[in-house]
Amino acid sequence: MNKINKSIATALLFGLVSVACIAQDDDGPAGFSYVTYHYCDVATQGAMDAAIETNEKAVFDKWVADGKLIAWGYLSHNTGGRWRRAQYHVSPTMADALNNQAAIFAEIYADNDAGGQARSAACAAHDDYIWALNQGSGAGTDRGDVSLSVYYVCDINREDRADEIVAETSGPRLNQMQEDGMIASWGWQSHRIGGRYRRLQTITGADHASVVQARGELFQYMNENHSELAEEFTDICGSHTDYLWDIVHEAP
């Protein structure tokens, strides 16, 4: 089993994925995050927040404390696309991620039909993804209060090359930005199950302005120092959607 602590799991996911690669027990991903991205009516999304706080938070916290989950968290939309809320949990394998998704909600709502119905009414549609945690901030990293998440649409036949470019260019630069205090953490993750997005880059920091500034400085660095590789990356992953998330709950 890969060993992964809070700083790795959460930094990878919204922060989540160094050095340019996390130390692992083998060559596989450090973990797998099951993420549910919710479409909510802005008039009712507060009911989802209440359901998480009242019905789910204590159970998720206990699962983490008991070692059933590596980490979990809940995020609120600030800026970006149509997703309004995101909830995630991290497991050591993809099979565990799938099984834990079913088991924990069965535990929470088995005897609370009304709570489950209220939750569904608050956010009536969602997208599920499983992300493999591949590159990002290493052990001992505390992530920030907000996350800039960039969801990339990539050529499935060449996306592994995009991973190599990140490891060679932007990854080391993000490590330096973290050491310099410009960002709190960063991550790079790959699609395993879900919709059209194939890669996810995350940067966390103290506030929205700082993570946006950091991304702008990363663009400038790439254009000035790795312009050909930056063009190659854009050719592989030519479309993306940006989100700014506020981190509402997380454990450990």
Residue spans of the language-model regions?
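Short S/T/G/P-rich N-terminal loop/turn motif that feeds into the first structured element of a domain
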Residues: 22-111, 117-252
